[in-house]
UniProtKB/Swiss-Prot annotation:
Entries under Pfam families matching the protein: Ribosomal_L36
Protein's UniProt name: Large ribosomal subunit protein bL36
Claim: Ribonucleoprotein is one of the keywords in the record: yes
An annotated Gene Ontology molecular function: structural constituent of ribosome
GO CC annotations, alphabetized: cytoplasm; ribonucleoprotein complex; ribosome
Keyword set, alphabetical order: Ribonucleoprotein, Ribosomal protein
Family: Belongs to the bacterial ribosomal protein bL36 family.
DNA-binding as UniProt keyword: no
GO BP annotations listed: translation
Classification via NCBIfam families: rpmJ_bact (TIGR01022)
Length: 37
């Protein structure tokens, strides 16, 4: 899980979703997990 100021899709499978007011990136590739903070 990376915590970043700006979250971006890294690959085609990445999805940007908003969960409890927090932007997150979920993906099959575990390395690509991110959240905004």
């Amino acid at each position: 899980m990376k915590v970043r100021a700006s979250v971006k899709k890294i690959c085609q499978k990445c999805k940007v979703i908003k969960r409890n007011g927090v932007l997150r990136v979920v993906c099959d590739v575990k390395k690509h997990k991110q959240r905004q903070g």
